[in-house]
Amino acid sequence: MVTTRIQVKEYLKEYLLGKYNDGVDGPLRIPPSSDLYELCYNLVGKRPVSAGPDSGNVELVLRNRTSCKDPRVYNWFCPRHQLLIERKVKLMMRAEFHDFVDLHHHRYGMTYVDAIAEFMNRFGIVSLSEETLVKDYQRYRNRVRPHEKRYYKKCNDK
């Protein structure tokens, strides 16, 4: 089993561990059917001679696919590729978060705050506050379903 480390923001680490490792801290095994797995496989490269040891807060397990890239040789992500992976994880988290809150609010009748708290508990996210996620959801909701300003006519029936 070959592993490598990447640096991502703390709340994204918590999301990844909650999604793929059931909240257990340890090497992260991304399923091969995931888009994130394909992205990581496409971005992994040979370790340069000048590269130091891996540093980061997320340890990824690199699986051996039958074609091309042997993980014993291809086991390094440059800083630019780490940023691309971080952006992809952030996009995945936000999409799942918005879908989760919409589903729980409209289908199960939960309030937005309760649905957000449930999302945080399910994925073990503690480095973000609920207010941050509430504000993010409000921005998303206003962008997707903007409110129309209602114009009232003044009525002088007296």
Stretch-by-stretch model annotation:
Residues 86-108:
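Positively charged, polyanion-binding regions of nucleic-acid-associated proteins
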Residues 118-134:
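Short, basic interhelical loop/turn and adjoining N-cap
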Residues 150-158:
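Intrinsically disordered, low-complexity basic tails/linkers immediately adjacent to helix-turn-helix/homeobox/MYB/SANT
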Residues 102-123:
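Short, charged amphipathic recognition helices of the HTH superfamily
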Residues 1-78:
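Long, low-complexity interaction regions most often at the N-terminus
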Residues 136-151:
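Short, basic alpha-helical nucleic acid-contact segments in DNA-binding proteins
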